[in-house]
């Protein structure tokens, strides 16, 4: 019997009643991972021995009835540091890197007696939208194994969608939680910038990166955010705001809530069937008592261009630390220090990572800084101001998460511009540091469609309230891919 169909609260009740032990739950989770892994390829590392040791220790001291997460397995994206467990960022450059410390988000999970079951596959250094740039493998969509799972947190999304684990962590720099959540029909949240500590997250774009949760349902997603959100002196960008319970508004009605629907989010480049799905969702919100009105975010069309200048510039700086000297891959054909640097970085980084390093270095170079990086920062401010104007009158913004459903494997990985445009609807949220969630909202050609809800800073509770209200009157989150299996 698999437990992958049980909610976290149901699993907690079983653990407290001693109908199952943490060890049994961990063993069953490991079985679920193994039985599905060949089909989807969610994991880079499965930490079986460490997980079973931790489960045994939890059983020895007993499940804490007041701690919902006690004994619950957790999958962690492979750019989030885990002490004693390989953390590769899906790169040859870090193929053998074993951190000597835990990321704060992981430490918070351990403090709640969660069990890290393994590290999930991703695009190399989180640069990509399909989980095809990983050095190790290509992850496949849980619903259709000929399609991509999205990225960069593709493995974290498919691990939940395929029933391998109930909960996972990802990171989101330009849509890397929300896009794979949409493509796989699960719930993925990018919190407000600074809500979850970035300490221990392998940096890509430091002004954009944010760790966040994946789960099958809105409430479980909020329950995991309760665990990982915290202020942290180890992260200078950590926010002092801390909500006591992100589930506090779940179950409340949304009568009187004002929701904005940007016309730009339903314009050029958006699949007509995606547009129909979003408009149907808007009607559902109106039926629940909310007001939905069209607004404009005029500068959102510049988001992709702004993002790829800023994110690549930050990446070119952040990735300078990977040089083969102290840890990770080192080229064995180098004869002097210069060759160590050049050969290691040439051989250790994949094509997409090198492309972004070069783009960022160019944008920061003398003579081009003002025209590119400085200008991008100025347009970023205009995008932020657009959001501020809307949130002066509205509680939330509604739109599609992605312009299309999941695309085929090997169809866009040789066309970087087309791949970049897949993040058209998620990128502005990162540029503005806002919270955004993707929830299941329908299907097109048998593939899930994600609905995105965006709030002002620190409005995660309101986002969860609206998302849960929609979830309560729809059944999209209950539909599972064939691979999920298990008792229903």
Curated annotation (Swiss-Prot):
GO biological process: translation
Reaction(s) catalysed by this chain's protein: L-glutamyl-tRNA(Gln) + L-glutamine + ATP + H2O = L-glutaminyl-tRNA(Gln) + L-glutamate + ADP + phosphate + H(+)
GO molecular function: ATP binding; glutaminyl-tRNA synthase (glutamine-hydrolyzing) activity
HAMAP family (UniProt xref): GatA
Functional summary from the UniProt entry: Allows the formation of correctly charged Gln-tRNA(Gln) through the transamidation of misacylated Glu-tRNA(Gln) in organisms which lack glutaminyl-tRNA synthetase. The reaction takes place in the presence of glutamine and ATP through an activated gamma-phospho-Glu-tRNA(Gln).
PANTHER family: GLUTAMYL-TRNA(GLN) AMIDOTRANSFERASE SUBUNIT A, TRANSAMIDASE
Assembly: Heterotrimer of A, B and C subunits.
Name of the molecule in the record: Glutamyl-tRNA(Gln) amidotransferase subunit A
Organism: Streptococcus pyogenes serotype M6 (strain ATCC BAA-946 / MGAS10394)
């Amino acid at each position: 019997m698999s437990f992958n169909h049980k909610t976290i609260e149901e699993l907690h009740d079983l653990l407290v009643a001693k109908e199952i032990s943490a060890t049994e739950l961990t063993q069953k989770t490991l079985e679920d991972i193994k039985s599905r892994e060949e089909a989807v390829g969610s994991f880079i590392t499965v930490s079986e021995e460490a997980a079973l040791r931790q489960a045994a220790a939890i059983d020895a001291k007993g499940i804490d009835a007041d701690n919902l997460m006690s004994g619950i397995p957790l999958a962690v994206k492979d750019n989030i540091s885990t002490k004693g467990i390989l953390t590769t960022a899906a790169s040859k450059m870090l193929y053998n890197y074993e951190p000597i410390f835990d990321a704060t988000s992981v430490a918070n999970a351990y403090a709640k007696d969660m069990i890290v079951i393994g590290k999930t596959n991703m695009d190399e250094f989180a640069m990509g939208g399909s989980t095809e740039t990983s050095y190790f493998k290509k992850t496949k969509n849980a619903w259709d194994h000929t399609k991509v799972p999205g990225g960069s947190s593709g493995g974290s999304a498919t691990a939940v969608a395929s029933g391998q684990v109930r909960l996972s962590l990802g990171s989101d720099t330009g849509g890397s939680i929300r896009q794979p959540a949409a493509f796989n029909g699960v719930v993925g949240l990018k919190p407000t910038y600074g809500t979850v500590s970035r300490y221990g997250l392998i940096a890509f774009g430091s002004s954009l990166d944010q760790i966040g949760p994946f789960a099958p349902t809105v409430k479980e997603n909020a329950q995991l955010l309760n665990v990982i959100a915290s202020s942290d002196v180890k992260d200078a960008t950590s926010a002092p705001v801390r909500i006591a319970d992100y589930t506090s508004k779940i179950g409340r009605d949304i009568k009187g809530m004002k929701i904005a629907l940007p016309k730009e989010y339903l314009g050029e480049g958006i699949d007509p069937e995606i547009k129909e799905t979003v408009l149907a969702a808007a009607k559902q919100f109106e039926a629940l008592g909310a007001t939905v009105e069209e607004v404009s975010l005029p500068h959102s069309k510049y988001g992709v261009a702004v993002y790829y200048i800023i994110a690549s510039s930050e990446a070119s700086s952040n990735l300078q630390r990977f040089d083969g000297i102290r840890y990770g891959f080192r080229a064995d054909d180098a004869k002097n220090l210069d060759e160590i640097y050049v050969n290691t970085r040439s051989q250790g980084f994949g094509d997409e990572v090198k492309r972004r390093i070069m783009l960022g270095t160019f944008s920061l170079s003398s003579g081009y800084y003002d025209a590119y990086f400085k200008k991008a920062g100025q347009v970023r401010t205009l995008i932020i101001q657009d959001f501020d104007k809307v949130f002066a009158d509205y509680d939330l913004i509604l739109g599609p998460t992605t312009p299309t459903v999941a695309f085929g494997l090997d169809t866009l990985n040789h066309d970087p511009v087309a791949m970049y445009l897949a993040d058209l609807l998620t990128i502005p949220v990162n540029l503005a540091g806002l919270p955004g969630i993707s929830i299941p909202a329908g299907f097109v050609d048998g593939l899930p469609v994600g609905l995105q809800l965006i709030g002002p800073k620190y409005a995660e509770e309101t986002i969860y309230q609206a998302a849960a209200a929609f979830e309560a009157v729809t059944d999209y989150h209950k539909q599972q891919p064939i691979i999920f299996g298990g008792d229903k």
